[in-house]
Amino acid sequence: MEEQKFHSLVKALNEHEGIEEVFLLNKDGSIIYKSGEFSLTDDEAKSILSAWKEKEPSLSFQNFRFAILKNDDLQLAAKNIGKGKGNIVGSITREGDYLIAHTRDEALILLEWSIFINKVAWS
């Protein structure tokens, strides 16, 4: 995916309040683009994608655990339970990359975020 398209997807995601960070990973879990300066290492990105692909029960982001509630080949939906650290949602893109966002518990509920990121990723 070209950088300009990534930034247009980030803009579309920001239609709703609650988007914290957005990042794009390739099929190996390497970071292609990030929506801003935030802490995300290549190892952490690879771990998130591995949890998604391997259908693990949880993933870690910024040292917080997120329980994976929806996990299929196209979409990911995970929630931080008890610590108030929001959600991780993701969708595969037309190009085969993985668009992932960290959201707050505002505007949309977790499954709505999951559907929304999928809609944006395929636009």
Swiss-Prot record:
GO terms for molecular function: actin binding. The keyword Nucleus does not apply. Transmembrane segments: none annotated. It is found in: Cytoplasm, Cytoskeleton. GO terms for cellular component: cytoplasm; cytoskeleton. It comes from the Archaea. Gene3D superfamilies: Dynein light chain 2a, cytoplasmic. Keywords: Actin-binding, Cytoplasm, Cytoskeleton. Binds to actin and affects the structure of the cytoskeleton. At high concentrations inhibits spontaneous rabbit actin nucleation. This strongly suggests this archaea has a profilin-regulated actin system, and actin-type genes can be identified in this organism. It is not clear if Loki profilins 1, 2 and 3 are from the same strain. Belongs to the Asgard profilin family. This is Loki profilin-3. It comes from Lokiarchaeum sp. (strain GC14_75). The lineage of its organism: Archaea, Promethearchaeati, Promethearchaeota, Promethearchaeia, Promethearchaeales.
